[in-house]
Amino acid sequence: RQRQMCIRDRLIGKYMGKTPKKGKSYSWVPNHIQDANGELTPRPFLKCFSFASNEMIKHSDELNDLKEDHLLVPTYLQGALVTVSEDRVKELTSEEYQWLTELIDRLKGKTMLMEKDEFLEYLTPDLWSEEKKDELPGRTKQEIYSVLLALGIIMETSDSRVNVPEIYLYGFGLKRKGGIRRPK
């Protein structure tokens, strides 16, 4: 863990901003790309740094903004999160969870956190096309909800609202009330 912190500090610095207010860089990336079950897969983790690096190359004039011997400006990591999320959702929907595409279309533009009852209405099996109904992981909206929970795509808060972690938020076309605008 200590070595990982040291590497991350050298890449982007100790903090995601000038002060600890925006978070420590060591925990920021995993906290923002883990699913609702706290699982972190290597591909999105690595892609976050890859996408951020590619943006740094495109904006080489900002290399002068780098502090000391750092390699990345933290805002590029924050911006990469949007692309990583979109990429992760494409992976899911192109592989074994193609039924999610119609749910994504229904949820696009909605704001999280959402009341559970409202969210469940988007899961009503009758809303899916006949073709996709056969792919659904359940016959009721509650069964589909349970699968989304198990997959880590959604989480339920203590006050029974539904939340979506950032690894899926942007790929689903969702917004977060009071959320910060991500750089592109």
Task: Give residue spans per PLM region.
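C-terminal leucine-rich, beta-strand-based interaction scaffolds used for sensing/assembly
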Residues: 8-184
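Short, small-residue-biased leader/transition segments that mark boundaries at the very start
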Residues: 2-7
